[in-house]
Amino acid sequence: MSGNKSALSVVVAGGGTAGHIEPALAVADAVKAAQPDTRITALGTARGLETTLVPARGYTLELIPPVPLPRKPTMDLVKLPTRILASVRKTREVLDSVDADVIVGFGGYVALPAYLAARGGVLRRRRKIPIVIHEANASAGIANKIGARLATRVLAAVPGSGVKNRGDQDAEIVGIPVRASIANFDRAGLRSQAREYFGLPQDGPVLLVFGGSQGAKSLNDAVSGAAEELAKAGISVLHAHGPKNSLEVTQYSETAPYVAVPYLSRMDLAYAAADATICRSGAMTVAEVSAVGLPAVYVPLPHGNGEQELNAKPVVAAGGAIIVSDNELTPTFVAGTVVPMLSDSARLDKMSSGAANVGHRTAATEIARIVLDIAAKENAVQENARGNR
């Protein structure tokens, strides 16, 4: 781009999974709210969820070749340098075309190429672009660990995530950015509307069950298997079983229904309708559930590097949740542990306060402030450079 710039240009890099995309979009929204004329560009891949999520939020999506970083030595590791070079080359073109003032990276398949295109060694551009990194998980991925060493500011959701800046200092703790509808959430105020929306009774406890965008069979089996015990205790259930799964549950009570749906498009109303939830403990899920002060039973994914359990531990320590392993989540556990929990309003109130104390509702706004400050300084440097030509 040539000539004078009319607005700051912010590039967000966090494609691949919802756990990377949603924080990026939350920050993008906060940036636009603070400075509406800012130009936002999102980097993504053709196979990621960003192909639908980013345009739906009104932002420009630029596709680059993905660079999945293998956790174990495989043939993919041999192909990695070639893939990185191709992706960095394409990313450079995007950064040049939008005249980026700052890159905000959230990890994932597009983050490493963005970091290297901005500052990376022999791959360095004609000018450096400031980098802000945010690590949402309790255990950082490879891309953000590398990028943190190149970044202007390094931010994280929780202490001890493994991302350190160039001075080997730990990241600044800001929490996980959540969308405005969650940050400004009034669970009690929306309760009546939410329950009517889902066909749930206005009175009595409600258990929310969801296993991510695709559902989770272990959660489905355990909770549906305890349907009779839940109904006898007067507990209604709102259960998102996943679009690829089916769930047939006997209705044991007219006053405490079991509402099973493939997918929840209105998670804000689902949170408002519920008194507690059983769910996975991905970083974004924990952030949202904590931000709205919803007591939780977290069931970490049984595979991976254990980061989901780490994500939930601060909430458990604050008294806002309990953790159960995937193989221990059974109908017997639901009947023996979850039913008594939902039947104890004093305990739920205490757990709600504990969860809310851990939640960071202002993270997106705080990160946006940091990003805009860095972008403005870079923009001024570039304007001065143009004026001296």
Curated annotation (Swiss-Prot):
Hydrolase found in the keyword field: no
> Key word Cell cycle present in the record?
yes
Kindly state which keywords UniProt assigns to this record, in alphabetical order. Cell cycle, Cell division, Cell membrane, Cell shape, Cell wall biogenesis/degradation, Glycosyltransferase, Membrane, Peptidoglycan synthesis, Transferase
Q: GO annotations under biological process?
A: carbohydrate metabolic process; cell division; cell wall organization; lipid glycosylation; peptidoglycan biosynthetic process; regulation of cell shape
Q: How the protein sits in the membrane?
A: Peripheral membrane protein
Q: Which residues form the signal peptide?
A: none
| First-tier enzyme category under EC | transferase
GO MF term set:
UDP-N-acetyl-D-glucosamine:N-acetylmuramoyl-L-alanyl-D-glutamyl-meso-2,6-diaminopimelyl-D-alanyl-D-alanine-diphosphoundecaprenol 4-beta-N-acetylglucosaminlytransferase activity; undecaprenyldiphospho-muramoylpentapeptide beta-N-acetylglucosaminyltransferase activity
Identify the residues that bind UDP-N-acetyl-alpha-D-glucosamine.
Answer: T17, A18, G19, N137, R179, S213, Q308
Q: Which CDD domains match?
A: GT28_MurG (cd03785)
User: Which pathway is this protein engaged in?
Assistant: Cell wall biogenesis; peptidoglycan biosynthesis
GO CC terms = plasma membrane
Catalysis performed (reactions):
di-trans,octa-cis-undecaprenyl diphospho-N-acetyl-alpha-D-muramoyl-L-alanyl-D-glutamyl-meso-2,6-diaminopimeloyl-D-alanyl-D-alanine + UDP-N-acetyl-alpha-D-glucosamine = di-trans,octa-cis-undecaprenyl diphospho-[N-acetyl-alpha-D-glucosaminyl-(1->4)]-N-acetyl-alpha-D-muramoyl-L-alanyl-D-glutamyl-meso-2,6-diaminopimeloyl-D-alanyl-D-alanine + UDP + H(+)
Per its UniProt record, what SUPFAM superfamilies does this chain match?
UDP-Glycosyltransferase/glycogen phosphorylase (SSF53756)
Q: Which InterPro entries match?
A: GlcNAc_MurG (IPR006009), Glyco_trans_28_C (IPR007235), GlycoTrans_28_N (IPR004276)
The EC number(s) this enzyme carries: 2.4.1.227
Q: Where in the cell is it found?
A: Cell membrane
Purpose = Cell wall formation. Catalyzes the transfer of a GlcNAc subunit on undecaprenyl-pyrophosphoryl-MurNAc-pentapeptide (lipid intermediate I) to form undecaprenyl-pyrophosphoryl-MurNAc-(pentapeptide)GlcNAc (lipid intermediate II).
Q: Which family does it belong to?
A: Belongs to the glycosyltransferase 28 family. MurG subfamily.
Q: What is this protein called?
A: UDP-N-acetylglucosamine--N-acetylmuramyl-(pentapeptide) pyrophosphoryl-undecaprenol N-acetylglucosamine transferase
Q: Which organism was this protein described from?
A: Rhodococcus erythropolis (strain PR4 / NBRC 100887)
